[in-house]
């Protein structure tokens, strides 16, 4: 399934996602604005267009302790937890936690990609995905865009070497930023081989499906479920 990660909430924009052949999306909010009611409103609209919607929260902080506290606070309130990266200690804290799903924009505001061999190993061990944020690339031009592409390539090389999950997102906030999933796939094909590009396109759904399973009422933890006995 093709699952995007974005902040789309208007009906006309959600309708466009359907027309562009997305199967669903993660609707994320920042931790300081998180509202379950807002997610439920988006979910109701999306389901009317037969789109699968998952709730997400993006945590933005420069404190490792605050990051851990917020992850603990939101883990059972939403499907996907993203951490806004850029600060090296935050990048590291994010990939050290099993409860974090995605490290977003690890290169943000940096002169390097934000990921090295050590962080790649940690991300692999804890199954924390690294995000390729397409909007950050489009919002740059000239040298800055070329440098961001270089960072993407570096992180993809490390991710493949250490078996780190990778996701790609449009991070769209309006209909003008929404992209066709086939365009994202074509973009990935310029960076990596086609089979790896296909794998990246499928990763967001796999993470969402795993978290959706863990949020079921009868699931204690992965592989442990409470089964109700049928009365004779």
Swiss-Prot record:
Protein keywords: Cytoplasm, Endonuclease, Hydrolase, Nuclease, tRNA processing
GO terms for cellular component: cytoplasm; ribonuclease P complex
Gene3D superfamilies named among the record's database cross-references: Metal-dependent hydrolases
UniProt EC number: 3.1.26.5
Localization terms from the record: Cytoplasm
GO BP term, pick one: tRNA 5'-leader removal
InterPro entries: Pol/histidinol_Pase-like (IPR016195), RNase_P_comp-3_arc (IPR023539), RNase_P_p30 (IPR002738)
Subunit structure: Consists of a catalytic RNA component and at least 4-5 protein subunits. Forms a subcomplex with Rnp2 which stimulates the catalytic RNA.
HAMAP family registered for this protein in UniProt: RNase_P_3 (MF_00756)
Known function: Part of ribonuclease P, a protein complex that generates mature tRNA molecules by cleaving their 5'-ends.
Descriptive protein name: Ribonuclease P protein component 3
Species annotation: Methanocaldococcus jannaschii (strain ATCC 43067 / DSM 2661 / JAL-1 / JCM 10045 / NBRC 100440) (Methanococcus jannaschii)
Taxon lineage: Archaea, Methanobacteriati, Methanobacteriota, Methanomada group, Methanococci
Gene behind this protein: rnp3
């Amino acid at each position: 399934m093709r699952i995007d990660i974005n902040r789309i909430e208007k009906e006309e924009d959600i309708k466009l996602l359907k027309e562009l052949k997305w199967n669903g999306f993660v609707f994320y909010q920042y931790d300081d604005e998180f509202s379950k009611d807002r997610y439920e409103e988006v979910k109701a609209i999306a389901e009317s267009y037969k789109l699968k919607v998952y709730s997400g929260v993006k945590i933005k902080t420069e404190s490792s302790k605050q990051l851990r506290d917020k992850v603990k606070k939101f883990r059972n309130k939403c499907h996907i937890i993203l951490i806004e990266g850029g600060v090296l200690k935050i990048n590291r804290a994010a990939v050290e936690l099993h409860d974090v799903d995605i490290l977003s924009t690890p290169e943000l505001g940096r002169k390097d990609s934000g990921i090295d061999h050590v962080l790649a190993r940690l991300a692999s061990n804890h199954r924390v995905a690294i995000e390729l944020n397409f909007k950050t690339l489009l919002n740059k031009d000239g040298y800055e865009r070329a440098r961001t592409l270089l960072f993407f390539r570096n992180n993809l090389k490390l991710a493949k070497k250490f078996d780190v999950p990778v996701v790609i997102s449009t991070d769209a906030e309006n209909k003008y930023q929404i992209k066709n999933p086939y365009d994202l796939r074509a973009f990935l094909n310029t960076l990596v081989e086609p089979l790896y590009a296909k794998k990246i396109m499928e990763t967001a759904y796999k993470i969402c499906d795993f978290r959706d399973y863990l949020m079921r009422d009868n699931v204690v933890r992965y592989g442990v479920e409470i089964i109700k006995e049928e009365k004779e």
